[in-house]
Amino acid sequence: MNFRFFSIFVFILVFQTPSSMAELSIQITQGVDDPIPIAVVPFFMDSGSVLSEDVAQIVRNDLEQVGEFRALPLSNMISLPDEEQEVFYRDWRILAQDYLLIGKINQQPGSQLIRVQYEFFDVNREIKLAGEVLTGNVTQLRDIGHTISNVVFEQVTGVPGAFTSQLLYIVSENAGPNTSLFKLEKSDYDGARPQVLLESGEPIMSPSWSPNGQEVAYVSFETGLPRIYVQNIASGQRRQITNYPNINSSPVWSPDGTKLAMVLSKDGSPD
């Protein structure tokens, strides 16, 4: 699975302190005038297990959130195929659907491993556009769903999907009278699975992903002055890399991830 990494250079102001209230919410308020109709059939679970994530619903949400697709409501579906021989194209043409996605999930009893098989069809041309088997741990169901969304999006639009992207953003919470708590967080592109990377009583600014997504550079005022830090995402280990007078800001990684460009004013004016 390929992941992309983006930084949001804004503060998200959160005044409720419970973590459930602080989750990042991303909403698309306007899409195209004539969204593409697509039917995403619930994926058949052949082992009878109940999973923590609904892969088909993740795909529906992904495609609708970008504003270019309109998913068929489940209540309008007249059949629920889970393999190609069960697909009757006329049924989906009657429902005015251009595309159809079906799938099935298998989990061995007592195992955390899953096997997700999906197939994607062009209803009007009556052909299968894509299909494959994805395997992973049950904790990767969201990643698998986003990966399928990428395939569907690219097959239809010709543009690579970005649903496996991750975001960096900064949250400012009201921690009491005249007191703020700043958090550097990362999440899926849709705000799901937020993870706090750093908490501070002083401002945090300008988060920047390393090209391989394993580290993040940012500006922290924890010493009372703006200083640039680099932090490993997995371990949480961090190191201060600048301590110049005045401005130390705006870190940006080189394409190979070995260097950082930044704005400094150690000689009196920003460079």
Model features per residue range: what roles?
Residues 188-205, 231-249:
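Multi-bladed beta-propeller domains
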Residues 16-17:
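N-terminal signal peptide c-region/cleavage motif recognized by signal peptidases
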Residues 167, 213-217, 257-261:
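Hydrophobic beta-strand positions that form the internal "hydrophobic ladder"
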Residues 27-90, 101, 105:
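Short beta-strand->alpha-helix linker/helix-N-cap micro-motif
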Residues 24, 84-151:
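Amphipathic beta-strand/beta-sheet edge segments enriched in Tyr/Trp
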Residues 161-163, 211-212, 255-256:
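Residue-level detector of Asp-centered blade-edge/turn motifs that repeat once per structural unit
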